[in-house]
Amino acid sequence: MLMRTITLLTLSLLVSAQALAEDVSMSESQRAELAKVAPGLTITPELAKKLRAAAYDQSLSIPERVEAIRRLAGYPDGEMIKRTICIWDIAGRSGPIYAAAQDQRSQILQYGVEVDMIPYTSETVLAEDLKSGRCDAGLMTGLRARLFHRYSGTIDSVGGIPNDEQMRVLLQAVNHPKNADNMVSGEYVILGIAPAGAAYVFVNDRSISSLAKAAGKKVAVLDYDRTQAEMVSQIGATPIASDIVSAPNKFNNGVVDVLAAPLVAYEVLELYKGMTPNGGIVRFPLAQITMQLVGRSDKFPNEIAQLVREAFLQNYDLIMTRLGEETGKVPAHWWIDIPQRDQQEYEIMMQQARLHLRDQGYYDPEMLALQRKVRCRFDGSRAECVNPVE
């Protein structure tokens, strides 16, 4: 999957972001870029229209769709084109994500493109470098991606998607060519979305089995997300600002009593230390977490981004299998089951939270509506299917 993804990203470097628009509107910098990779090429509306049709036509094979772009863009002659892809890997250069990306360098070079892949252990720094233009694209969590692209960032909304199968259907809809325009937001375009599993509540005391019982406890919240602190305060708990790396350490060291995290973090981040001896994991998913590849729209045209998004989607089952292998490492004794009535209460509270965050401009209303449609597709008896508020 990674080879195909990197290859598609490479091809996208050969095309100006706006050169494919039907009105063929380009900035001076984009014209200069195009002249470098395809000297003498004149783009007509007819050529752009044909390319766009081929790029979004899922009845064609990926090589056929890519070939249309290659013929139009041409290849650079002599000078290498350079782009920077920044990769957030908690283990940095020794991490599996960064290592896999580095392995593709020889594949990329044959396209006449030099890609500088930079590992980041700090998601905050990566995000700032993407904003400043030091990164042409960045791999980050969906929670962070919301700062760049509210529509895709809302996929990680609290209670928005209850399980893996619903997540699959949602991503199929999100990544469909008919939805391509929604994947561009100003200066940024979504190049890919991958599932990272459901987030659960980890506690250091099994008595904290409900939101009401979290009152007076310390809860880790992301320092860049003020709404998390607001929600925690509303249930009478104390928010403790953290980043995505320090939060697990605070939980393991007893600085915070409650931590929301995906199950894959259990072994990797040694969260069993924070739960020992009397803690556990509340068996109720808070949200479906994603990893998202966010690119600068002046560097990556949406036509190529569509192919990359589809490459991500095609590997949904493989990713979920690997996530399952990791989550299977969580011993059964850690699970805390909660009564059905409490689960229903949680669903109501999460819906209220989504509505509140939507009205504040934090969540995208179109994505929330799509998530509701997915939930109702699986269970039409839900009250929200009769009287929708999202």
Q: Can you say where each PLM-predicted feature lies in the sequence?
A:
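Positively charged n-region of N-terminal signal peptides that target proteins for export
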Residues: M1-T5
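Short, well-ordered beta-strand elements
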Residues: R71-I97, V115-P119, G216-A220
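Short helix-initiation/N-cap motifs at beta->coil->alpha
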Residues: E114-E128, D223-R226, T238-N253
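A ligand-binding cleft/hinge motif common to bilobed small-molecule-binding domains
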Residues: G142-S152, P248-N253, L259-R283
